[in-house]
């Protein structure tokens, strides 16, 4: 009996969709309400309990009980006890399920020694429960007897989805999907049921992730082809003929809707359409394709009309707009992207070929120490984030809390109040409407506000001095680490009184920093604070453990090994700390990124296929260089910097996949050797490809004076770092020269993500 009641109650709760609105007077505070079995919510009515108990008495004592005053009194007494129980339990009102009320009636009947009446009441409830159960089974049988609309196509989609995938069963997908369908179900619900049924099987068999992706692809085809006035019921086997038409129709529609660059229509769409490879749709995992659907595909009023291979061709066409042989290069780029051998950065995938082709990943800015500059930097953040750029802000120049303000003769509130505004700006201005805005604030370790800065991501404290949506990073000079190791004191300064520290590195920084310490002791510097270096380091590490912030970045290593140190100073890294570029009032540094998928570059013996890797990197470097010329620049300082220095960043992904394939533990010496070998190979081919491109396009404008022009490779610049560090700190010496030009100032990096399509 208890099991039956529990089942009924569970079913009722599942069906609890309040289909009828409740009158306002029934929503007053203190009201008791009842959830009926059909899900409807009504006011608690004690008279209904009186009727039910009276019927139970009549069943035992016959109709004479109806005229008995003692029975009426007993019914009234029992009903009030039931009501009082719930009033005491919920004095402020609340909602009770009908089963709970009936349980309480049973209990009160038993307590009052009316056992015969209680027994009759229980039997009545069981009889009603059995009737409801039979009615439910009958309704289910009726549904099963009627065939589902389009069942033949459902079976065909499932069969196509599982083709060639070991361990998958199309019948199982269809069976699970049919459990959630009904006669007359809309097309969208049928497709969604198929996706959910297949997705639920992924944990049992990983290959279902590919099957689910193919089912999702069928749903996408229906949506896109219908919008493009093509055969919306097409299956994957039909796409060889349909993809060229879809490309042409997509370009035409996109230009009409003012979403795509009209220059795309000037290319030979027929030639490009013939090169599309529909079979590469089957390379997607479910998560990869769903991510593209949610964020990347071009849409009109939330209707996606861009198919996966059209998407890759659109990106490739956008990157080839300035090429002499546009179609040939677009095809070359398409083959690389659609194979997943190489993947462009998210902004490039978002915006290539569109009217605002903002293709760069991250922007680095330095914030000046005045209100116009501070709020100007925030405006730049908003404009850059609008077109999907990530942001890295250097806040070290802004004076610390308590520092004197000459203009107002007041005291500064420091950087933290401004960072709160930056945090909220990043939330308010998302990245092209496709993902949240993202920013990282950098502060050098000697800044007077560093201790408060470390606590910005804490969940406790004054929320006006917290930035829950913004990343933070600590820009650490080597001298601080020396003080930590030697257990010495560390002095914090306000940058308005230690003006040049932020622009100095290595031995020059150390010399000037110690001079400022002497000036502070003499009383010539007002805003400063001495702290224990080790204690500050402990706080940094504690906050990193507690909040994941601040990230640790090292100023001297970044600057002393920079190929571009002749043109300025690196004041910070970017949003994801993977690239370090010069910034100033006239230059907002720009990251132009992409990554090679190492997993796709293994030979039959599972070793790196270096010949294929060389070809991939050669094409990738060209694509990245094209980004610089095609890119839409929301602010002029970014354009100035990007054209002057032309930095690109080629990273890798798939390293963990290789370790799995080769059965190498991540923490082993073998893994370290593989990492060293793979990155050395990528580095060499990236520099070689850059040099080859320079022969065609010439070197970048600030090339002369760079470490490249001096024949110093990035790996060789470690000797420069050695000169500025304590004796014996590093013991490495390499002899190697480079006599090539290069069209870009930076070529490769460590990417911040392992996400993959």
Residue locations for each model-derived region?
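Function-dense linear segments that define catalytic or interfacial modules
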Residues: 298, 311, 315-330, 334-358, ...
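N-terminal glycine-/lysine-enriched basic segments
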Residues: 143, 180, 633-649, 676
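Secondary-structure transition/capping motifs at alpha-helix termini
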Residues: 60-63, 115, 162-167, 200-206, ...
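Conserved, charged catalytic cores of large soluble enzymes
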Residues: 227-322, 407-421, 433-437, 442-550, ...
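Often metal-dependent polyanion-binding catalytic scaffolds in large enzymes
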Residues: 1-305
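Flexible, glycine/charged-enriched surface loops at secondary-structure junctions
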Residues: 63-74, 92-98, 116-121, 167-174, ...
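Conserved small/polar residues in nucleotide/adenosyl-binding loops
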Residues: 747-753
